[in-house]
């Protein structure tokens, strides 16, 4: 799992790119799905939980075609992944 966050210009613009070109590119890098959340305190921030491994995430972020998709989606910078600390059973 990968938890990532970024700021966006407009949610509809973000969603249009995320759910089309972004989804296709993520799939190419092994993503199995995502859950998108809007931040309750910052209207211009989204959080996404990806069903993805670290290698796939890094390959996606370094793909030379991805910045254009981010720009189309109105992202304000490259998404940042939270550091995974450890799992817990409850």
PLM regions: where:
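Short linear sequence elements within intrinsically disordered, low-complexity coil regions
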Residues: 16-19, 23, 42, 55-57, ...
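Glycine-rich beta-strand-turn "strand-cap" elements at beta-sheet edges
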Residues: 29-46, 69-90
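Short amphipathic alpha-helical segments
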Residues: 11-33, 64-70
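Short, well-ordered beta-strand segments in beta-rich or mixed alpha/beta enzyme
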Residues: 1-8, 34-63
């Amino acid at each position: 799992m990968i938890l990532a966050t970024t700021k966006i210009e407009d949610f509809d613009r973000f969603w249009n790119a995320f759910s089309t070109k972004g989804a296709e590119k993520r799939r190419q890098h092994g993503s199995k799905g995502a859950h998108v959340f809007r931040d309750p305190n910052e209207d211009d921030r989204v959080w996404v939980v990806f069903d993805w491994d670290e290698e796939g995430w890094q390959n996606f972020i370094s793909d030379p075609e991805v910045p254009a998709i981010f720009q189309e989606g109105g992202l304000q910078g490259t998404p940042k992944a939270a550091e995974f600390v450890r799992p817990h059973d409850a």
